């Protein structure tokens, strides 16, 4: 009996050991299987990672479509069930589920079924939490039935739980996978949408920029293919009285007429009477009766016969000498000889002016004749509504007076349907030196390319430096040069005075100047009532400051400068010109030194001295016009040696005796010239440095390019050869740079990973972008780089935005190297914005905001260029 008990116990021990061994083997197999599955999963992930981006995108799209279809089907089923379901149907479902479980466990399983049914959606939404299932419960019941003792082995229970975890991990709800796929798809779609949005914004920016560029682009005209009609240039028949003059008589007459100097071949002899010109009676009535001009002035005596003979001329004469009438009379005779304008044809006479005020002055002079002669003239300039100008041109204007910028806008508007220059045969450039000095050379060249080559071109100015003379000869064919009274000479009718202030503190010097100005104004107002005073200053801010001071001293006055709107400038000139306005003082920058002709202007005060002598001549030339007397007073300090030298030179050239010039001025002049000889200073005069070539680096690069192309010849030995095919003059052997070399850089918004090399220090960011803004219009650039715009973008995107590079004019090629302090270094690139950020997303957001600002700025620039026309015609 005892042996049987021991045998049974040994067998039970053996069976337990076998069971344990068997379970351990099962556990090892399970672990091996799990490791193998994990390796297979890693391989699948690696294979998926190596797939191309295109395959991923296609797979995403397919999955997205499948998910959408399945989602749509589920929503339909859910909607149907929500409508049709009832408590009876719910009970029948529960009964069917309950029937699959044994009867003794029905009460328990019903509860579990109900619990599982209620939490089904939650299990889908929260897959991390393990939920009990009916399958696991039935397995537990089977284990209990297999065990005869009804006991549950701990190891069996552990292995069963592991198998359940494995099965649950393999059986992840499909809804969770689909949700993950949907998230990936949504991320991909959002990236695609962002790329599409950036692409659309870039296309919009490009189109607006191109549209703004095209507004000022003129079509290239091949004049050799155009069928131009012939026209007459020569309207002058020399009277027999003049034909009988000998050469000595002609020279003496020219000497009497303020020393006229002429250069060129076959120069006509000067005239002394209006009748010598052979003008029609209608012209003579206006000249002698209405305008009361008794005889031609010096410039008119020589220029009128030369222009009426059909010659191109360069006329240089002092201010107020009647240059305007010298080109107006031949132009009217020229137009009257040609057929009337037809619909769609442009003007016959074209007059270009560097400033708006001068254009208005010329137009006013022309209207004295056009009203009686049945002609029409149109004045076009920027800063005023364009619709009225378009309306006048549409009606047909035989004479067009304007500034180069606005004329180009009108020519380019509506693809050239507003007006054209095919009928133009007479061209005038008034104040031509200032035209080139202000950087209008590209615009003038553009306009001249639209005009037939054999047209007659006339240039007039009060000064004509050698540099500008060479540029002007490109536009003329075999021109005559007529110089009256010398170049850059103040008229003898003007009394020149200088107020010298010794060097001191700036505030003290300013107080002394203002006190002296008040004394002069008080004395002048007593001696010359209702006379006008024009005060010149150097800067716009100085004009506004002086206005406040004079108003505080009970001196009514107005200001005019480039920073004011056109309507304000026009109002200021109108009030100043009126006798009864009560405003007898006008403060201005050098913008009023050209074309301002006000009757009763007896005093000009240079509160700040001009920076060169030519500007001085034009400033003081606003008084003493048409033979009247005038006074010019210039304020200068002893440390302004260059200005003092110019003043002494101007007075000397005006034939003022040296003993009448203050000795202190001559002393300062001599000291300065000694410094120039010693090489301490460089003394130059004339216009220059305010136009397109104002940057030293650009001047150096231009000079080096010219040396390579033209050779090291001196400017004085340059020979000009007329090119009859295009009406321009070229240097021997000159070759022009192709236009393609000067390209317009559109802004690029590419984000680059890594630190920008142009920044330094520990704060370098991980992503950066360079946005070129050099070639944007000035208004658009200001819109982007102004402090408010950049600060908002920096705050909202947490990026760093810095201005880099240097501004280059659109037609200027960036040099490779520049000379700084005698050393050559790489030239700075075109102006751009450097955007830096810690993340790629922040840089992209900043780029997007900058792009929006650019688009907004281009829209504003386009509106301002057209002045928002509201009339019948629009650009």
UniProtKB/Swiss-Prot annotation:
Its main subcellular localisation, reduced to a broad class, is nucleus
Q: Which keywords has UniProt assigned to this entry?
A: ATP-binding, Coiled coil, Helicase, Hydrolase, mRNA processing, mRNA splicing, Nucleotide-binding, Nucleus
Q: Enumerate the catalysed reactions.
A: ATP + H2O = ADP + phosphate + H(+)
* Motif Q motif per record, residues: 272-301
User: What EC number(s) are associated with this protein in UniProt?
Assistant: 3.6.4.13
- What start-end ranges are recorded for coiled-coil regions in this protein? 177-217
Basic and acidic residues compositional bias, start-end: 10-20, 32-45, 53-88, 132-153
Molecular function in Gene Ontology: ATP binding; ATP hydrolysis activity; nucleic acid binding; RNA helicase activity
Record field: compositional bias (Polar residues): 162-173
Annotated Helicase ATP-binding domain ranges read 304-482
Annotated Helicase C-terminal domain residues? 519-669
Membrane-crossing segments per the record: none
> What subcellular locations does the record give?
Nucleus
**Which sites bind ATP?**
317-324
Q: Give the span(s) annotated as Disordered.
A: 1-92, 108-177
Motif DEAD box, chain ranges: 430-433
InterPro entries (alphabetical): DEAD/DEAH_box_helicase_dom, Helicase_ATP-bd, Helicase_C-like, P-loop_NTPase, RNA-helicase_DEAD-box_CS, RNA_helicase_DEAD_Q_motif
Which is a GO BP term held by this UniProt record? Answer: mRNA processing
In the record's own words, the domains note is: The Q motif is unique to and characteristic of the DEAD box family of RNA helicases and controls ATP binding and hydrolysis.
What this protein is reported to do is described as: ATP-dependent RNA helicase involved spliceosome assembly and in nuclear splicing. Catalyzes an ATP-dependent conformational change of U2 snRNP. Bridges U1 and U2 snRNPs and enables stable U2 snRNP association with intron RNA.
Q: What protein name is recorded for this chain?
A: Pre-mRNA-processing ATP-dependent RNA helicase PRP5
């Amino acid at each position: 009996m005892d042996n049987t008990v021991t045998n049974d116990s040994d067998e039970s021990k053996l069976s337990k050991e076998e069971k344990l061994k068997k379970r351990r083997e099962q556990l090892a197999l399970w672990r091996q299987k799990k490791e193998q599955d994990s390796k297979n999963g890693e391989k699948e992930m690696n294979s998926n990672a190596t797939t191309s981006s295109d395959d991923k995108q296609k797979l995403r799209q397919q999955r997205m479509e499948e998910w959408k279809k399945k989602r749509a089907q589920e929503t339909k089923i859910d909607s149907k069930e929500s409508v049709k379901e009832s408590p009876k149907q719910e009970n029948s479902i529960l009964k069917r589920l309950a029937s699959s479980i044994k009867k003794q466990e029905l009460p328990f399983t019903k509860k579990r079924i109900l619990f599982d049914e209620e939490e089904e959606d939650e299990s889908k939404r929260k897959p991390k939490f393990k939920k009990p299932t009916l399958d696991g419960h039935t397995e537990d019941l089977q284990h209990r039935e297999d065990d005869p003792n009804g006991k549950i082995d701990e190891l069996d229970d552990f292995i069963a739980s592991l198998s359940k975890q494995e099965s649950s991990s393999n059986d992840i709800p499909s809804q969770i996978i689909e949700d993950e796929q949907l998230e990936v798809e949504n991320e991909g779609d959002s990236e695609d949408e962002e790329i599409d949005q950036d692409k659309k914004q870039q296309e919009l920016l490009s189109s607006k920029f191109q549209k703004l560029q095209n507004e000022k682009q003129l079509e290239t005209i091949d004049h050799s293919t155009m069928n131009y009609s012939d026209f007459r240039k020569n309207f002058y028949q020399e009277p027999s009285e003049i034909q009988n003059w000998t050469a000595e008589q002609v020279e003496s007459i020219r000497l009497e007429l303020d020393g006229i100097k002429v250069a060129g071949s076959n120069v006509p002899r000067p005239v002394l009477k209006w009748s010598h010109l052979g003008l029609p009676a209608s012209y003579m009535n206006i000249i002698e009766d209405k305008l009361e001009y008794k005889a031609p002035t010096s410039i008119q005596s020589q220029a009128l016969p030369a222009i009426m003979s059909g010659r191109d001329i360069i006329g240089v004469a002092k201010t107020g000498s009647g240059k305007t009438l010298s080109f107006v009379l031949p132009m009217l005779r020229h137009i009257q000889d040609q057929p009337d304008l037809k619909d769609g044809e442009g003007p016959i006479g074209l007059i270009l002016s560097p400033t708006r005020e001068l254009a208005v002055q010329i137009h006013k002079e022309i209207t004295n004749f056009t009203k009686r002669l049945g002609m029409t003239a149109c004045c076009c300039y920027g800063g005023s509504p364009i619709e009225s100008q378009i309306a006048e041109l549409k009606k047909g204007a035989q004479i067009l007076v304007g500034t180069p910028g606005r004329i180009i806008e009108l020519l380019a508007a509506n693809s050239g349907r507003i007006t054209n220059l095919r009928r133009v045969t007479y061209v005038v450039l008034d104040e031509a030196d200032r035209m080139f000095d202000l950087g209008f050379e590209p615009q003038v060249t553009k306009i001249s390319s639209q005009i037939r080559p054999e047209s007659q071109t006339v240039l007039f100015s009060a000064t004509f430096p050698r540099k500008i003379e060479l540029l002007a000869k490109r536009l003329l064919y075999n021109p005559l040069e007529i110089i009256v009274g010398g170049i850059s000479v103040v008229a003898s009718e003007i009394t020149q005075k200088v107020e010298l202030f010794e060097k001191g503190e700036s505030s003290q010097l300013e107080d002394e100047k203002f006190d002296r100005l008040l004394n002069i104004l008080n004395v002048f107002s007593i001696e010359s009532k209702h006379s006008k005073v024009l005060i010149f200053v150097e800067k716009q801010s100085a004009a506004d400051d002086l206005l406040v001071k004079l108003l505080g001293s009970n001196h009514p006055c107005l200001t005019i400068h480039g920073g004011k709107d056109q309507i304000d400038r026009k109002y200021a000139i109108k009030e100043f010109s009126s006798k009864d306005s009560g405003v007898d003082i006008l403060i201005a920058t050098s913008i009023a030194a050209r074309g301002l002709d006000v009757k009763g202007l007896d005093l000009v005060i240079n509160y700040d001295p001009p920076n060169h002598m030519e500007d001085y001549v034009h400033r003081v030339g606003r008084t003493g016009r048409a033979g009247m007397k005038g006074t010019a007073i210039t304020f200068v300090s002893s440390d302004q040696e260059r200005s003092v030298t110019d003043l002494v030179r101007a007075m000397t050239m005006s034939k003022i005796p040296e003993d009448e010039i203050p000795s202190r001025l001559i002393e300062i002049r001599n000291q300065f010239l000694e410094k120039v000889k010693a090489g301490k200073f460089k003394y130059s005069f004339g216009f220059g440095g305010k136009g397109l070539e104002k940057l030293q680096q650009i001047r150096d690069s231009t000079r080096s390019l010219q040396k390579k192309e033209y050779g090291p010849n001196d400017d004085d030995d340059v020979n000009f050869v007329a090119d009859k095919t295009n009406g321009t003059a070229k240097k021997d052997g000159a070759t022009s740079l192709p236009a393609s070399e000067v390209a317009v850089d559109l802004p690029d918004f590419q984000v680059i990973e890594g630190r920008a090399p142009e920044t330094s220090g520990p704060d370098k960011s991980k992503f950066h972008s360079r946005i070129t803004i050099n070639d944007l219009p000035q208004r658009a650039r200001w819109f982007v780089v102004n402090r408010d715009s950049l600060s908002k973008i920096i705050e909202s995107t947490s990026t760093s935005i810095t201005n880099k590079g240097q501004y280059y004019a659109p037609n200027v090629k960036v040099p490779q190297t520049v000379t700084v302090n005698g050393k050559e270094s790489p030239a700075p690139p075109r102006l751009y914005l450097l955007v830096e950020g810690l993340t790629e997303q922040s840089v992209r957001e900043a780029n997007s905001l900058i792009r929006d600002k650019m688009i907004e700025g281009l829209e504003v620039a386009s509106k301002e260029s057209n002045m928002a026309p509201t009339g019948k015609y629009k650009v």
